[in-house]
C-alpha cells in the first residue's frame, strides 16, 4: 500500500521544513505571503504557517486512519503544496530582508532579518558538524562546535538587542 509510504514521506518533509524554518519562524512580515486557498491563517509570522502545515499533517493522518480516500488525496495534495510554498519562502528570505527599508524601523527589520539568516546558517553548520562528530570523535570538530556555539550566542545577543530596539520604536 502506498499510503503509509506517502504519509511517512510527508512527515519527513514537514520535519525537515521545521528545521529549515525554525530560525525564521518568529520573523514578522508586513504583507501576506501565501494564497488564501493554500493557508487559512493570516498570521504575520512564518511560524504560524508552519503550524498550519503541521495541523494539515495531523488531519491527513486522521483521514488515513478513517480510510477516507478522497479526503486523503485532497489533504496530501494540499500539504505538499503548503510544504513547497514554505520551502520557497525560506529560500527567498534573504532576498526579502530589505523590502521594508522605507518604513519606520525598516532598517532595523532588515538588520534583524540579516541576523536571523546568520543564525539559520550557523545552526545548519553546527548541526552538520555535530553529525560528523557523532560518526567520528575528532577533537578538531569539537573545537569547531564550541566556536559555532560562541558565534550563535553572539548572534542571538544581536537579535535580542535589535528586537528591543524595534520594540522601543513601535511603542
UniProtKB/Swiss-Prot annotation:
Keyword Methyltransferase: no
Top-level taxon in the UniProt lineage: Bacteria
Keyword field: DNA replication, DNA-binding, Primosome
Keyword Metal-binding: no
InterPro entries on file: PriB/PriC_sf, Primosomal_replicat_PriB/PriC
Pfam family, one: PriC
Function: Involved in the restart of stalled replication forks, which reloads the DnaB replicative helicase on sites other than the origin of replication. In vitro can load (E.coli) DnaB replicative helicase from a DnaB-DnaC complex on a single-stranded DNA (ssDNA)-binding protein (SSB)-coated stalled replication fork with no leading- or lagging-strand in the absence of other primosome proteins (PriA, PriB or DnaT). Binds SSB (tested with E.coli protein) and ssDNA. Complements priC in an E.coli priB-priC double deletion.
Family of the protein in this entry: Belongs to the PriC family.
Record text on subunit structure and interactions: Monomer. Component of the replication restart primosome, which is composed of PriA, PriB, PriC, DnaBe and DnaT; DnaG primase associates transiently with this complex. Interacts with the C-terminus of SSB. SSB interaction is required to load the main replicative helicase onto substrate replication forks. Interacts with helicase DnaB alone and in the DnaB-DnaC complex, probably 1:1 binding with DnaB.
Comment block on domains: Known ssDNA- and SSB binding sites are adjacent in the 5-helix bundle protein.
Name of the protein: Replication restart protein PriC
Species this chain originates from: Cronobacter sakazakii (strain ATCC BAA-894)
Amino acid at each position: 500500500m502506498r499510503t503509509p509510504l506517502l504519509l511517512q514521506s510527508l512527515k519527513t518533509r514537514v520535519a525537515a521544513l521545521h528545521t529549515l524554518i525554525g530560525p525564521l519562524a518568529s520573523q514578522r512580515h508586513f504583507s501576506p505571503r501565501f494564497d488564501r486557498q493554500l493557508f487559512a491563517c493570516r498570521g504575520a509570522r512564518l511560524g504560524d504557517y508552519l503550524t498550519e502545515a503541521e495541523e494539515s499533517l495531523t488531519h491527513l493522518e486522521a483521514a488515513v486512519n478513517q480510510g477516507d480516500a478522497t479526503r486523503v488525496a485532497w489533504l496530501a495534495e494540499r500539504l505538499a503544496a503548503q510544504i513547497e510554498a514554505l520551502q520557497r519562502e525560506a529560500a527567498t528570505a534573504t532576498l526579502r530582508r530589505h523590502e521594508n527599508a522605507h518604513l519606520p524601523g525598516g532598517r532595523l527589520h532588515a538588520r534583524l532579518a540579516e541576523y536571523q539568516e546568520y543564525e539559520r546558517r550557523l545552526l545548519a553548520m553546527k548541526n552538520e558538524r555535530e553529525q560528523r562528530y557523532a560518526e567520528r570523535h575528532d577533537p578538531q570538530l569539537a573545537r569547531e562546535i564550541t566556536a559555532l556555539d560562541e558565534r550563535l550566542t553572539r548572534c542571538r545577543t544581536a537579535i535580542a538587542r535589535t528586537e528591543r530596539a524595534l520594540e522601543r520604536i513601535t511603542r
